[in-house]
Amino acid sequence: MTPAYRAAALLAALAIAACASAPVTLVALPPAPAPEMRDAGPGPTVLLRKVTVPGYLDSFPVVVGRKGSVLAVSDSTEWAERPSLGVARVLRDALSQRLDAARVLIEGDGRIPDADLTVEFLALDPQEAVLHVDARWSFSCTAARGSRAGRSQFDVPLASATPGAVAAATTEALARLADVLAAAVPCPPRQYSDRKPTVR
């Protein structure tokens, strides 16, 4: 083996080792900013039951672009948590900022909500300079009869095709959706009686 061949082999081995040991950067959704206006008065309570995102987005590699059916994925950055969990967490927090924390229940709270809320994202896709959002949502009243469903479609500006920009745009999109949902809660507050049962 010639010295030149040995040197080339050593450089190749070092390059492979460097690639194998390159750390993966993790990115998380930032918290939603506080709204300019909020409904802090009494009102119906809401439990965010289920949030789903498309399966192609609900994995750890960060999708930074989409053109048609072709996805562009970051090769060095992953989500710090499964996207469906992060989306639900940030959306729940954004709702609590708009409706008051006491009105947005969490699993295991022990109280019966006035409304169950389900959200299905059909798209939460980074495209050319925008994050495209298409979400179906449904409120179901738990005491009185009634429900309300809708579909929200809009675009949020995307600063760049990078994981950090995608995370920031996703949180902005969730805050905008929370504005819509907070104004759409259809159910009246559950009426509780203050009377104590009579002991015979």
Please describe what each predicted stretch is.
Residues 84, 88, 92, 96, ...:
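Extracytoplasmic/secreted envelope proteins and their assembly/folding machinery
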Residues 1-19:
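Sec-dependent bacterial lipoprotein signal peptides
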Residues 52-55, 94-99, 125, 178-181, ...:
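Sec/Tat-exported extracytoplasmic proteins
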Residues 99-105, 183-200:
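Surface-exposed helix-capping loop/turn segments at secondary-structure junctions
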Residues 69-78, 144-183:
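Short secondary-structure boundary motifs at beta->alpha junctions and helix caps
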Residues 19-81, 113, 189-200:
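A structural "domain/chain start" motif
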Residues 20-37, 97-143:
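Surface-exposed short loop/turn segments
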Residues 45-50, 63, 116-120, 132-138, ...:
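Soluble periplasmic/extracytoplasmic beta-strand elements of cell-envelope proteins
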